[in-house]
């Protein structure tokens, strides 16, 4: 009897593995993704192909990195998800002559009606938060330089002027797309009239992360975010940035690689679960690469896999609870928690119980395998993108062996128990002639925006002299 049961369990797990095998990407697959990514990057940088390229390669107008000679108080704002952060950053000289960056910050959550109402409502809410923050720190009387981290696709015309191309990550505020974001912020501050600000720079969160990490490691020339969404930036040779005049030096380019796949480059790798996630998203057919990797979608992918296993009678005796059939019920943090389970399955059991399920030991093991399959594919898919960027940098610099540091931020990268190890190992396999160091950014996007502002202010002072 016991043998029969054991045999049945073994057969069940075997069938599960056959279904999950679709998530495995071979080295050849990753090399294919990498070379397609490089091709799209090239198309994004070139004037004649930029418009139709899926990877937009947006120039950021960030040309120089901080040298540690900027001092002063700066305010920075960070808008990139459902939370909005205001931060006071003091850049100064620390003990023993080294540079110090001190921060105080406060988080504000963005109400749904501000995210999906009008641009005026959204920016009025943002300026209300700034006003509240300045009151708390008794800084209303000071006109501070402000750096704005704005993590959406923007076509820059200068460091402090950028047009929003399109909202992502569930934002839909009308009247913002096609407009200068810094202008919308300045208008909202003017409408309030109870404080003054000098908006000197707007940067993407990847850029802010790179600049923030540059303070710790002078070889940091790539910034990457793996959180709600996924994106990267890097220092490109100016001669390759055809959208901006001039051939000298380097400029930071925001790849906006989340949109890779929008022209069919990923079609052969998309599974039925990806198509379902895409169809029920706020932006069907867009940001397909990001939807394979980002935390906004990872839990939902797992939920759809679990439903498939239930339908195949391989999980929960073929019966799903009402909660499990509800979109968004399996949160991305559950993926991290399931994979962090110590082996006694207690954590997995608790999560499944909250979803109205009564799992067996085998059920718990199968759910863990489903989570591992989805998150490992995300790490490997992401590694192909970064390897594409790094190999491109090495080739354009004609270096036999390139040493480079990548600054990384984002909840998936930081909080998932094995994402970063799987990701690092895969990137290194795909970049044999590079020595890569990864550093995690601390409060990266706020500090980074302030440091970009500090560089801009320093330059303005030098030009004025």
UniProtKB/Swiss-Prot annotation:
Residues 10-454 form the Hexokinase domain. Pfam families: Hexokinase_1 (PF00349), Hexokinase_2 (PF03727). Gene3D superfamilies: 3.30.420.40, 3.40.367.20. It is an enzyme of class 2 (transferase). Expression is restricted to the liver and pancreatic islets (at protein level). GO terms for cellular component: actin filament; basal cortex; cell cortex; cytoplasm; cytosol; mitochondrion; nucleoplasm; nucleus. Substrate binds at residues 151-152, 168-169, 204-205, 231, 256, 290. One of its GO terms (molecular function) is ADP binding. Its EC number is 2.7.1.1. Its main location: cytoplasm. Pathway: Carbohydrate metabolism; hexose metabolism; Carbohydrate degradation; glycolysis; D-glyceraldehyde 3-phosphate and glycerone phosphate from D-glucose: step 1/4. Residues 67-203 are annotated as: Hexokinase small subdomain. It comes from the Eukaryota. Belongs to the hexokinase family. This is Hexokinase-4. It comes from Rattus norvegicus (Rat). The gene is Gck.
